[in-house]
């Protein structure tokens, strides 16, 4: 996943085309390419690449889009089609890809398809005289099947349950996508802060936290800083949905449950904050009525929801 430089050097492009045309399809030990083209005009928009290894049992993929075609979902659609085609070959058990750790857009493409961040190798990727880190993602056949089976299925029941010894292990193993970690802290940190309470205006906060359960499965975690002498309104401190259960409408249902609970308790406002940036939950919260207050808290944008309206 790189940004395709336009215009690409003609001599290099011709060498790539010549090498690809030697093969009818993905061939072990060789790179093979596909063109992403406009279905109507056939104009070139980008390309896909595949390299088979381990006697054809593993595939490394790459993708690139012309700058003017980015941000339209084309990379996700094309890469999904490629991954599905690869796993349609029964001998392939693993598909992997690598990218620059700062290329959040490319990371999100792989994460949407179920790829797992497997680590980052330091200063391992060279482009001429420039070296950078390389983030590695992988997807196994069994994970691909489970990901597709669970995609877009909305749960029948979503509940907020107390965390007990019986569900603690399920709660502490919840995880977001790797690219989302800059927006929400892991559960273990949240539970630690519930135990060792941070101070707000000189007073310890009052944590309120629950496991998010969808159809009897623990799928997320939510924590509020409750009303206190220094906190006039409940503050949504953490909202985390496990990577395997996102895009199922669960977070929206959690907000609905929180709003109903807080209205019943007489609260008039619900407050939260978020970091801006690619992949930020900002659009999600705005969609649900949270309006920026104009306050910035430690680099995060504060927003509130009026519970009286």
Model feature map: region roles:
Residues 33-156, 231-309:
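Acyl-donor (CoA/ACP) binding surface of acyl/acetyltransferases
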Residues 1-68, 85, 89, 123, ...:
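GNAT-family acyltransferases
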